[in-house]
């Protein structure tokens, strides 16, 4: 039996607008980001989900809270496994000022992110087999996560289109 996933990237944040490496920062939704979540709520009925699984970072949990609109979910797991790529010592810095030729050694590699996305996929397969699950997370993480679902090899993950803020994509595992 297939597990259906509604995969959503969090709403726009102040850090998105400022082109900041957010990584594991909590992030602050902009008014537009909140509005994006309200708009998504009109097209995604949260009552159809057996569970919600999200990153434990505030920008993701705030997006879920807006989508819920006061409803109490059956099951909501907030997990560090679904966090954005860890930018290490680049976290909080402006993207345009980073030296892409000499990334610090504490930055999570694409291989590490791909591996973590695989663990997240296994978690969902084990815990929610045959269920319908809302997954709310982050752009780069979700790119690797969806690549794992589609069985796209690591070398081709960059060719996967990333989700926009509060964009939803349905996939089955």
Predicted segment positions?
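Generic beta-sheet signal
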Residues: 5, 131-139
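Short active-site segment of divalent metal-dependent hydrolases/proteases
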Residues: 13, 141-142
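Short hydrophobic/aromatic-enriched beta-strand-loop microsegments
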Residues: 28, 72-79, 154-162
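Glycine-rich phosphate-binding loop signature in dinucleotide/nucleotide-binding domains
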Residues: 45-48, 124-131
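Domain-level recognition of soluble alpha/beta enzyme cores
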Residues: 150-173
């Amino acid at each position: 039996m297939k597990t259906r996933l509604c995969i959503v990237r969090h709403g726009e944040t102040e850090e998105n607008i400022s082109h900041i490496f957010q990584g594991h920062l909590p992030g602050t939704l902009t008014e537009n980001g909140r509005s994006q979540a309200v708009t998504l709520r009109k097209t995604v009925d949260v009552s159809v989900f057996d569970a919600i699984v999200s990153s434990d970072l505030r920008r993701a949990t705030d997006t879920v809270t807006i989508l819920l609109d006061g409803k109490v979910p059956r099951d909501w797991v907030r997990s560090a496994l679904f966090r954005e790529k860890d930018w290490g010592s680049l976290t909080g810095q402006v993207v345009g000022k980073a030296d892409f030729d000499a990334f610090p050694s504490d930055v999570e590699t694409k291989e590490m992110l791909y591996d973590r996305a695989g663990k997240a996929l296994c978690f969902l397969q084990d815990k929610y087999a045959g269920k319908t699950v809302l997954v709310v997370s982050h752009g780069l993480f979700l790119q690797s996560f969806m690549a794992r679902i589609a069985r796209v090899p690591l070398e081709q993950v960059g060719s996967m289109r990333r989700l926009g803020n509060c964009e939803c994509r349905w996939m089955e595992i």
